[in-house]
Structures are given as C-alpha cells and as structure tokens.
C-alpha cells in the first residue's frame, strides 16, 4: 500500500540542496536544455550540459550526478551517453535514466535496455515508459503516456527490485518505489503537462537528489514533491505562457526562501 509523502522529506531535501549544491551533468534532449538548466539553478543545484563524446566521459567522473535523457537520441549521442555512464559508475557517481518514448521507438528502447545493465541509481518516467521498460507494454503515444501511474506501479516495483534501484513513475499522482516501499506524491496542476519540459526537468532534479546523502527513496520522492508544489503555485498565473517563469520563481522561493 503506498504511503503518502509527508512534508518532512521535502523540507530536508531543500536543506540538502542548499548545503551541497550538486553538480549535475545533464545529457538531456535538445528541446529542454535551457529550461532544465534553469530548474536546477532554481533549486540550488549546478547544471552542466556536456555532450561531445570526447568530453562527456571525462566530465561524468567530475560531476556529482549524471542524467541520461534519450528524448533526442542520435547515434553519436548514444556513444557519448554510454561512455559517460561507464565513467560515472567507475567514479562512484550516481546516474539517472529518463527513458523518453521507450517502447514507442525501437532504437531508443534497445539502447535503454542496454543501459539498464549499468545500474542506474534512479529511473524517472511516465507510466507508459515504465511499463515498456519493464517489458509489460509496447509503450505510449510518442512521448505521451496512455496509462495511469497507478497502473504502472507493479511494473515500477518489479523494475526497482530487479535492478536494485529507485523508480519514479509520474502522473497525476507520482509513485516512487525501491521495490518494497512505495511513496505516493500528490499535488501539482494539469498546466504542468501543457508546457514542454516539466518531466525532463524533474528527472534532472531526481538526478541531483540521488547524489545527496540520506534515504534515496525519500530524496527522489521529495524531488517529485518539490516540483508538484511549485507547479501548483505557478498555475495560479492562469496559462502556459506565464507558467514557466512563475514555476521557476516558485521553485527558487521554495528552496532559497
């Protein structure tokens, strides 16, 4: 039975982000790079977008955490991502997988399954992506989910147990599990789905949280809670055009205020 996330882990995550300011190596998609960087800065982390295959592996060992987001995957980018993950592992740095549109497209599906053998510290995806990654579904409609997070929870638990990782399946309610414990995170606002990049940016905050000390399950769930709280505040502006700056302001005020 999922346990509702209480406010204490979110408050603790705010403190940890301020205290540690983790450097997050974001190998993310072209559509969301600026927004992702701004979200990380707003929560007190430090972003870097190093993608060249000649540099990515070296930087992965320097950063505190690595994010792999396959949204705009290319052959060269896959080479760089694979090398970065391998070097992050060798350096003992946690890496997070965002399996964008897995199941819907064959190349990225095969690539993400290959990366699973390299032990991600956390996985963050929508319901259809998590179901596909666990081998329980063919995937959603491109980057959009066709399933509910609750329906994908058994797949998330199975994936977490198999890989000894933390899996966050996000939607109207987010579920975060290590295979045994399950935390549910309510809140947010539907406007979060009407702008590009909130899920991808969440994955970056998850990556940052995975690098922090303490209970990784609670840290990842708190990252989801932090984003949902900011989304609910920003939605008071009334539309997607004003949502993004209000969202960044809300995140900053939550963590730094």
Curated annotation (Swiss-Prot):
Disulfide bonds: none annotated. ATP binds at residues 124, 170. CDD domains: THZ_kinase (cd01170). It comes from the Bacteria. Substrate binds at residues 49, 197. Transmembrane segments: none annotated. Pfam families: HK. It catalyses: 5-(2-hydroxyethyl)-4-methylthiazole + ATP = 4-methyl-5-(2-phosphooxyethyl)-thiazole + ADP + H(+). GO terms for molecular function: ATP binding; hydroxyethylthiazole kinase activity; magnesium ion binding. Keywords: ATP-binding, Kinase, Magnesium, Metal-binding, Nucleotide-binding, Thiamine biosynthesis, Transferase. Pathway: Cofactor biosynthesis; thiamine diphosphate biosynthesis; 4-methyl-5-(2-phosphoethyl)-thiazole from 5-(2-hydroxyethyl)-4-methylthiazole: step 1/1. InterPro entries: Hyethyz_kinase (IPR000417), Ribokinase-like (IPR029056). Its EC number is 2.7.1.50. Its cofactor is Mg(2+). GO terms for biological process: thiamine biosynthetic process; thiamine diphosphate biosynthetic process. Coiled coil: none annotated. Belongs to the Thz kinase family. Catalyzes the phosphorylation of the hydroxyl group of 4-methyl-5-beta-hydroxyethylthiazole (THZ). This is Hydroxyethylthiazole kinase. It comes from Klebsiella pneumoniae subsp. pneumoniae (strain ATCC 700721 / MGH 78578).
């Amino acid at each position: 039975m999922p346990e509702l996330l209480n406010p204490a882990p979110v408050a603790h995550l705010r403190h940890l982000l301020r205290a540690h300011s983790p450097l997050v190596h974001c190998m993310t998609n072209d559509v969301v790079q600026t927004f992702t960087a701004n979200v990380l800065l707003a929560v007190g982390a430090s972003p870097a977008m190093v993608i060249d295959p000649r540099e990515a592996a070296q930087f992965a060992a320097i950063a505190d955490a690595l994010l792999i987001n396959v949204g705009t995957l290319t052959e060269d980018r896959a080479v760089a991502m694979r090398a970065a993950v391998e070097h992050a592992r060798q350096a003992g740095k946690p890496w997070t997988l965002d399996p964008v549109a897995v199941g819907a497209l064959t190349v990225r599906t095969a690539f993400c399954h290959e990366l699973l053998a390299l032990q991600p510290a956390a996985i963050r995806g929508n319901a259809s992506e998590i179901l596909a990654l666990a081998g329980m579904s063919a995937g959603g409609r491109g980057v959009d989910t066709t399933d509910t997070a609750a329906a994908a929870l058994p797949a998330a638990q199975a994936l977490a147990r198999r890989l000894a990782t933390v899996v966050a399946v996000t939607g109207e309610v987010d579920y975060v599990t290590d295979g045994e414990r399950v935390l549910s995170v309510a809140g947010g606002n539907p406007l979060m789905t009407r702008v590009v990049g909130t899920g991808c940016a969440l994955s970056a905050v998850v990556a940052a949280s995975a690098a922090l000390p303490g209970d990784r399950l609670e840290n990842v769930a708190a990252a989801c809670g932090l984003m949902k709280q900011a989304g609910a505040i920003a939605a008071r502006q009334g539309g997607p055009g004003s949502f993004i700056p209000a969202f960044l302001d809300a995140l900053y005020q939550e963590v730094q205020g």
